[in-house]
Amino acid sequence: MKYNNTSEINPLDYILGQERAVEAMELGLKINNPAYNIYIAGEPGTGKSTYALKVLNEYASKKNTHKDWCYIYNFENPREPIIVELEKGFGRELKKDMEKLIESLLEDFKNAFESENFEIEKNKLLDEYEIEKDMLLKQIKKYGEEKGFKLKQSKMGIVFIPLKEEEDESDKSDEEFYKAKRELENMAIQVVYKIRNLEEIAEKAVLELEEEIAKLVVEPHIKRLCEKYENYDKIQTYLENIKKDIIEYMYLFYLDEEELKDKYDKEHFIKYKINLFVDNESSKNKESAPVVVEINPSPANLFGKAEYDYANGNIKTDFTKLLSGAFHRANGGYLVLYADQLLKYTMSWEILKKTLQTKKVILETQTAIKPENMPLDVKLVLIGSHYIYDILYRYDEDFEKYFKVFVDFDSEMDKNEDNEEGIARFIAYQCDKNNLRHFTKSAVEEVIKFSTRLSGDLEKLSTKFNKIMEVVIEGSAYAEFRNSEYTEQCDVKKAISEKRKRINRVETHMDESIENGFTLIETEGRKVGVINGLSVLSTGEYSFGRASRITATTSPGSKGIVNIEREVNMSGSIHNKGVLILGGYLSENFAQDLLLSLNAYVCFEQNYGGIDGDSASSAELYVLLSSLSGVSIKQNIAVTGSINQKGDIQVVGGISEKIEGFYSICKTKGLNGEQGVIIPRKNQRNLVLSDEVNDAVRDGKFKIYTVERVEEAIEILTDVKFEEIKKLVKEKLISFSKIQTVSKE
């Protein structure tokens, strides 16, 4: 590209270097099948989360599946609240409509039952009752007087008293007196029965009147709501039940204010409330499908929960206290979860699988309430590491059933013109987005060099854009400190060097230890059975190369090669394997006509923290051959590379860091033009060295040797032909064998 600075080029609008991942993601999003959920794997910083959200929002914008979800009271089974799906915005409308309905009815009922017309109609019914009641009482009163008794009403009923108490009852026979009294009492029973029957008829008539008025009050409101929600069968049924319930319990609507407050806050009026479970009217992107990211996937956060009231040691809840989870809010769209966080909650993972299996979002409570489950319509995107993917795939048989699409993010991409241009456009995008100083072309080239260094391969670029982004932000900051309009190459270099300075405390202390002579490393002279091996140490995000003194001693015996680190449990399995390979090499090259009879001890001197990896196996072989042959090894050359049993030198990691680590030691002790390193030839493409080391190599102050075979390396280290060394080693092993044979005799 021809440009002076990144303000002149188009910002990057796509994910860079992830063609395989993009194709897989597109496939997963296009297949509308509940088993085709997506697992995105990749190293931190490769942009998988950023890309996932970007592409999900793009797909979400193409389909408007936002729905509202409400829980309503179940009149047939109150323990099982009903879930209702409504068009976006209708949930909020329904909630408001029901609140207005109750408010209106409270006022309308009060007006209706306090109206003059109602009192007139009610009194008319009651007057009819009173007239008939009076007629019955008059009849029995008259008849009683004819029989000589006065009628008296009490709480116990009707009582008859003789009219003339002073009159001698002997004037009448006892039989006549009691006969008349019994007759009147029987008649009174019939009258009381008829009066009570009249009361029931009157009460029923008044109730029918009240119900008729209640219907006149309620039906217009319910009819209006039924028309508004005519497309929702569950709402139609609910409103019909509401009407019946209000008419049945209409007395609640004309209680005084204090009584009503208690009733409304507690029991009956809960039936008329709406739980707006998922309100998508309030979502940011109302015209697209939901995209939900849940960073704390606890069971409650994923699948919802119920809130509880505690009273007298008991817990109580109802459908209005049900709260939605991420699965509910994402329904009709996409849900993004992070695998490492999800697996912290074992129950979440198990319920998730059950949800995918049943195709229903399972909301569990601690009480008897069992809400109807929401039907599942979610594309699940799980983001995590390759390690977690492998573990789930291998040990969870359900994982493969529900995550059919694997989106694999690479940590590197080919170093070509298109991708280099992509990095320049990435920088342009970040500068525009974050208001940074735009980068000059030379500054961009320095960032590209940094990306190559991150990849550890001259033919690759890193896709760890979080690391690249750090350099971009910090480089821009240093340009701003200089009051420069643009970020220059020097700003990028300073950002990289200053970052290293902030995190290389351990490396600095180890350099000081070598300089002070506390750690024994020599960069001049020759020694038998001593070699400088190269390794990489990591402290958090920082890795650096170190030289370690490796020594070997040999003697007659039968122990074979003894890895001292292994004996004290300070070496890992890969390092142990590398040491065992040494025995295979020695057996093939020196023990075809004799038994190996030696004790060989190999040790990383002054190693107090353990070791793993096989990159020092070649150095261990060279130092063994030196000890056996008596040929000294140059201390000005350090070695890295693994070997196989056939003597081939194999590639290793961290090659640039190892070279720079030994160069730093040589620089501290004084460069003499003879110092250098031996590396595997196939590692040449991994040499992404600092400018200082490149300059030193170019100027002949430091050397890098590449080898493919053990024979090449040992000759560089000793200036002795391999055949001569082989002869000396063979002679020593023969002498060891003889000594061992004599000792056995």
Which role fits each region the language model picked out?
Residues 318-320, 327, 333, 339-346, ...:
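Peripheral, non-AAA+ core regions of ATP-driven protein-machinery
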